[in-house]
UniProtKB/Swiss-Prot annotation:
Subunit relationships: 4-HPA 3-monooxygenase consists of a reductase component HpaC and an oxygenase component HpaB.
One Pfam family, short name: HpaB
Official protein name in the record: 4-hydroxyphenylacetate 3-monooxygenase oxygenase component
Pathway the protein acts in: Aromatic compound metabolism; 4-hydroxyphenylacetate degradation; pyruvate and succinate semialdehyde from 4-hydroxyphenylacetate: step 1/7
Gene name in the database record: hpaB
Gene3D superfamilies in alphabetical order: 4-hydroxybutyryl-coa dehydratase, domain 1, Butyryl-CoA Dehydrogenase, subunit A, domain 2, Butyryl-CoA Dehydrogenase, subunit A, domain 3
GO MF: 4-hydroxyphenylacetate 3-monooxygenase activity; flavin adenine dinucleotide binding; oxidoreductase activity, acting on the CH-CH group of donors
Sorted UniProt keywords: Aromatic hydrocarbons catabolism, FAD, Flavoprotein, Monooxygenase, Oxidoreductase
Species of origin: Escherichia coli
Top-level division of the source organism's lineage: Bacteria
InterPro entries hit by this protein: Acyl-CoA_Oxase/DH_mid-dom_sf, AcylCo_DH-like_C, AcylCoA_DH/oxidase_NM_dom_sf, HpaB/PvcC, HpaB/PvcC/4-BUDH, HpaB/PvcC/4-BUDH_C, HpaB/PvcC/4-BUDH_N, HpaB_gammaproteobact
Length: 520
C-alpha cells in the first residue's frame, strides 16, 4: 500500500490524521536498543509527528488555503502546497516564499526538514526530467506523486565519516553501492548520514552531496528513492530530546525540545530491493557529478532554507527582547546595540529571500529558479549569523540563562515557591512564573541539547564551509559579476599613472605641487 492511498480524496494532500496513519507501516526504526513499533505513538517521536501532522492539517483550513495552496499542474484537478509545484515566474516564487513562511511559523522556524524542504527535489524532477536520461519518466512520475499528495521526502546524501582520506573503493563495505541487478530492480547495501527526521518521512532520496568524492567504481554512482518501509531499510536514531524532555521535565521546562525534535539517524540499507520505477540514475558517474549544478535542487532548496531561518530569527529576536526585559537590561545602550545587530541579521535573510524571488532567472521548460547570487550569499552568511547571534544572547542574557529552578515542579512546592517568587522574579513587576517560563524557553533554544544541536545544524546546513565559499566565488566568476568588478578596478587604475591623470576631465597638479618648487 502506497502512503498516498491513505487519503480519502485523490484531489488533495494528506490531512494530519491520514499522514499519521501512513507512517504505521512497520518501518524498522531503532532507538535505545529497541525497535519502535509505531513512531506516531512512541514517546521519542510522537510530538514531532503530531507537529508535522499540524502542517498537513493547515493545508485544509479555509483561512489558510489562500496563503498555502494553489491548484496542481498535473491535471488532477486538485490543490497542493505552493512550493510543491514548479514556479513559472518570479511572482510564482514570491507566492511560494510566502507559503513556506506561513508553514514555518507553525513551528516557529524550529523544524527545518518539513515536507516543503524536499518539495524542492520534487520540483527539480518536474522542471528538468530529461536530465535523468533513460529514467526520465520516473522523474515525471515522482514529480506528479509528490505534488498531488504532499509526500514527505527526506534525503541521505552524505557518506559516513569513516576513512575519508582513503579512495572510495577502500571503504566499499560502508558506502551505499550496487550489490546486483535484477528484473525487479537493483539491490543495494551500505549506509548514509545524516537522515534527519527520516523516521517520520515516507521516502528517502539517496544521492550525493556537492563536495563528495565518488571514486571510480560505477557501482557507487546511483541515485534512487527508497521507501522507508522497504525490507532492509533501517534507521538507528540518536538520543531523543523529545523523550528526555518528557521523562525529566514538562512543556514548561522544554517547550521546543518536547515537540520539534527532528531526530537525526544513521540510515542503513541491507540488501534492499529498489524497484526500477524508483531509480533515477544508475551507474552514471557523469550525471551524478553534474546533478548538483544541473539537477535544480541545489538552486531550489535554499529558498525554503533561507525563509525558514528568517522565521526562526523573527522568533529568536523577539525572545531575546523578552529575555532582556526579564533581567532589566533592555534600556542599556550596549544591550540595545546588540539587539539591533540581531535585528539586522534577521533583516538580512528576509532581504535575501526577497532577492531570490525578485531576481529569479528562467531555467528550462518554462521553470524559474531563485537568484543564484542571493542563495549563495545565504549559504555563506547563515552559519556566521547563527553563531554570532548565539554569542550575543549569551553575552547579554548571561546568568539569566541558568539562574533557573530545575523544574516546573519547584513552582508547585510551597516551601520553594515562596523563595522563587521573591528571588527569581522578573523586572518591572514581572512575576517569577513568567520570568522562568521565558528564560527556560530561551535556554531550550540555545543552551539545551536541542539548542546545541540546532547550532550544529545551522553551521553545517549547506555542507563544507570551504565548499560553500568556493561556490559563491565560482558563481561570481561564471555569472560575469567578477569580470564586471575587475573591469571597474581596471578602469580606476587606467585613469592615472606615475606621471599623473590620464583622463581629460581631471586637472594635474603641476601648478600647485609644492615638492616641485622645494626640490628645484
Amino acid at each position: 500500500m502506497k502512503p498516498e492511498d491513505f487519503r480519502a480524496s485523490t484531489q488533495r494532500p494528506f490531512t494530519g490524521e491520514e499522514y499519521l496513519k501512513s507512517l504505521q507501516d512497520g518501518r524498522e526504526i531503532y532507538i535505545y536498543g529497541e525497535r519502535v513499533k509505531d513512531v506516531t505513538t512512541h514517546p521519542a517521536f510522537r510530538n514531532a509527528a503530531a507537529s508535522v501532522a499540524q502542517l498537513y492539517d493547515a493545508l485544509h483550513k479555509p483561512e489558510m488555503q489562500d496563503s498555502l495552496c494553489w491548484n496542481t499542474d498535473t491535471g488532477s484537478g486538485g490543490y497542493t502546497h505552493k512550493f510543491f509545484r514548479v514556479a513559472k515566474s518570479a511572482d510564482d516564487l514570491r507566492h511560494e516564499r510566502d507559503a513556506i513562511a506561513e508553514w514555518s511559523r507553525l513551528s516557529y522556524g524550529w523544524m527545518g526538514r518539513t515536507p516543503d524542504y524536499k518539495a524542492a527535489f520534487g520540483c527539480a524532477l518536474g522542471g528538468t526530467p530529461g536530465f535523468y536520461g533513460q529514467f526520465e519518466q520516473n522523474a515525471r512520475n515522482w514529480y506528479t506523486r509528490i505534488q498531488e499528495t504532499g509526500l514527505y521526502f527526506n534525503h541521505a546524501i552524505v557518506n559516513p565519516p569513516i576513512d575519508r582520506h582513503l579512495p572510495t573503493d577502500k571503504v566499499k563495505d560502508v558506502y551505499i553501492k550496487l550489490e546486483k541487478e535484477t528484473d525487479a530492480g537493483i539491490i543495494v547495501s551500505g549506509a548514509k548520514v545524516v537522515a534527519t527526521n527520516s523516521a517520520l518521512t515516507h521516502y528517502n532520496m539517496i544521492g550525493f552531496g556537492s563536495a563528495q568524492v565518488m571514486g571510480e567504481n560505477p557501482d557507487f554512482a546511483l541515485m534512487f528513492v527508497a521507501p522507508m518501509d522497504a525490507d532492509g531499510v533501517k534507521l538507528i536514531s540518536r538520543a531523543s530530546y523529545e523523550m528526555v524532555a518528557g521523562a525529566t521535565g514538562s512543556p514548561y521546562d522544554y517547550p521546543l525540545s518536547s515537540r520539534f525534535d527532528e531526530n537525526d539517524a544513521i540510515l542503513v540499507m541491507d540488501n534492499v530491493l529498489i524497484p526500477w520505477e524508483n531509480v533515477l540514475l544508475y551507474r552514471d558517474f557523469d550525471r551524478c557529478r553534474r546533478w548538483t549544478m544541473e539537477g535544480g535542487f541545489a538552486r531550489m532548496y535554499p529558498l525554503q532554507a533561507c525563509v525558514r531561518l528568517a522565521v526562526k530569527l523573527d522568533f529568536i529576536t523577539a525572545l531575546l527582547k523578552k529575555s532582556l526585559e526579564c533581567t532589566g537590561t533592555l534600556e542599556f545602550r550596549g544591550v540595545q546595540a546588540d539587539l539591533g545587530e540581531v535585528v539586522a541579521w534577521r533583516n538580512t535573510f528576509w532581504a535575501l529571500s526577497d532577492s531570490m524571488c525578485s531576481e529569479a532567472t528562467p531555467w528550462v521548460n518554462g521553470a524559474y529558479l531563485p537568484d543564484h547570487a542571493a542563495l549563495q550569499t545565504y549559504r555563506v552568511l547563515a552559519p556566521m549569523a547563527y553563531a554570532k547571534i548565539k554569542n550575543i544572547i549569551e553575552r547579554n542574557v548571561t546568568s539569566g540563562l541558568i539562574y533557573l529552578p530545575s523544574s516546573a515542579r519547584d513552582l508547585n512546592n510551597p516551601q520553594i515557591d515562596q523563595y522563587l517568587a521573591k528571588y527569581v522574579r522578573g523586572s518591572n513587576g514581572m512575576d517569577h512564573v513568567q520570568r522562568i517560563k521565558i528564560l527556560k524557553l530561551m535556554w531550550d533554544a540555545i543552551g539545551s541539547e536541542f539548542g546545541g544541536r540546532h547550532e550544529l545544524y545551522e553551521i553545517n546546513y549547506s555542507g563544507s564551509q570551504d565548499e560553500i565559499r568556493l561556490q559563491c566565488l565560482r558563481q561570481a566568476q561564471s555569472s560575469g559579476n567578477m569580470d564586471k568588478m575587475m573591469a571597474m578596478v581596471d578602469r580606476c587604475l587606467s585613469e592615472y599613472d606615475q606621471n599623473g591623470w590620464t583622463v581629460p576631465h581631471l586637472h594635474n597638479n603641476d601648478d600647485i605641487n609644492m615638492l616641485d618648487k622645494l626640490l628645484k
